[in-house]
C-alpha cells in the first residue's frame, strides 16, 4: 500500500478526532509525503518531534516536542492524551539514527501498555539488516 493513499488516521473515523504522535526529522526523505497524507486525511491534531523547526502548512496542527526527544517525553505525551490512538515513526533510520533496538523495544512497551498502534515508514532504497530486526517490533510498516 502506498502511504500517500493510506489512511493514516488510526481508529474509527466516526468517533472524536484522534491524535497521532509522529517521531522523526521533518527533513528526512519522504516526510513531506507523510505530512501531506495526514493533511488529506483530515487529522485535526498530532504531535511532531523534529530536530529542526517545522514551518510548513501543518505547523498550526503539529506541536513541536523538544529537540532532544527522549522516551520519557514520549511517555509523558502518551500519558497526557487519552485519545491518542497510535505512534507513527517517520523514517526509522532518521528517527533512531543509532539504530538502537533497545530504544525501539521500550517504545514498543509504551505502546503495548497503552494499547496503541505502532507504525513506521522505511525507505525501499535504504533497507539494511538492522531494519529487518526492527521490523518485527512494529504493527505495520509503510515502505516508501
Where are these regions (language model features)?
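Substrate-engagement module of ASCE P-loop NTPases
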Residues: 100-127
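Conserved nucleotide-binding/hydrolysis micro-motifs of P-loop NTPases
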Residues: 17, 51-55, 94-95, 124-128
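Pre-Walker A adenine-sensing motif
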Residues: 1-14
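Conserved catalytic network of the ASCE P-loop NTPase/AAA+ motor domain
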Residues: 11-15, 39-42, 79-83, 109-115, ...
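Phosphate-binding/switch region of NTP-binding enzymes
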Residues: 122-144
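A short acidic, amphipathic alpha-helical/loop segment
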Residues: 33-37, 102-107, 130-133
Amino acid at each position: 500500500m502506498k502511504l500517500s493513499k493510506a489512511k493514516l488516521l488510526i481508529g474509527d473515523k466516526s468517533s472524536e478526532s484522534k491524535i497521532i504522535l509522529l517521531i522523526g526529522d521533518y527533513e528526512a526523505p519522504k516526510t513531506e509525503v507523510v505530512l501531506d497524507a495526514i493533511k488529506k486525511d483530515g487529522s485535526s491534531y498530532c504531535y511532531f518531534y523534529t530536530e529542526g523547526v517545522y514551518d510548513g502548512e501543518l505547523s498550526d496542527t503539529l506541536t513541536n516536542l523538544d529537540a532532544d526527544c527522549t522516551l520519557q517525553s514520549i511517555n509523558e505525551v502518551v500519558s497526557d492524551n487519552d485519545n491518542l490512538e497510535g505512534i507513527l515513526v517517520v523514517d526509522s533510520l532518521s528517527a533512531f539514527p543509532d539504530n538502537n533496538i533497545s530504544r525501539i523495544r521500550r517504545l514498543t512497551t509504551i505502546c503495548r501498555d497503552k494499547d496503541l498502534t505502532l507504525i513506521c515508514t522505511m525507505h525501499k532504497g535504504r533497507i539494511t539488516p538492522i531494519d529487518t530486526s526492527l521490523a518485527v517490533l512494529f504493527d505495520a510498516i509503510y515502505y516508501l
